[in-house]
């Protein structure tokens, strides 16, 4: 599922990891324990491909996904819990936005036989197919299910994230990881 082979990480002449190798199989659960500065966060950033090792390689199975919850949260206040959780669906939101743009253009169009109108119809058809394929019709209910499962009440979902403590904000971030 996930293989690390001869991973070396060096910073400014200091070696943090020296040719470490490990394998994680399907269903494995791991915990990283160590003192501050031991490299736990660095290793997780390497595993999520957020950072690159000095040398060595990682191999992931095709459908393998790795996420980690960072220690420091970077929240923009003003979003609701749902709006923040929907950020996990970047591609769906892009497709949805383009669909809305096309609908607005089509509402203003008078010539339904023009080449440009036909091209818009073709693009909209492709977008609709893509939207369905990537789960666009289910992401909202899926998001609610995950958030409720993490302990949020239905009334919480439309509340601003800045009204929640750090622990509850961590749960929102965890929901985003689970939804990706």
Where do the PLM segments sit?
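ABC ATP-binding cassette signature C-motif
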Residues: 1-180
